[in-house]
Amino acid sequence: NFNFSVIEKNFDSNTSKFKLNNRIKKFKMTSNEFFMTNSMKYDLIFVDGDHSSNQVKIDITNSWKILNKGGYLILDDYMWWFYKDLKKNPASSINNFIVNNISEISSLKIWQQVIIKRNIYLYFYFIQSIILK
């Protein structure tokens, strides 16, 4: 069992210096509630939510829609210990997302967390290839 109040206090302590100048904002709600009400775009999104493969897929897809080009998407618990079946593990949805969106990814780091940088040059390369033909 997890003591979420301790986890939240640690998060608040670790991010407190960024809250002073409004560089970070914590949203305390389900990701589905957040995506239904959010209208902003972000340079950095850190996803550490429901670890079921289906919800991870939804969270990644929704996060990608609001991630600025050149922004970073960080996905926690790549190989979640609770799910021994890879199809149920977050890694399954993360791997599928990477394969399906590789042309929009300029940098990728995988360990316990996955760090994806969204490509800012996708449209430039497309336009350049049309002009040069």
Locate the predicted segments by residue:
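S-adenosylmethionine/decaboxylated-SAM
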Residues: N1-K133
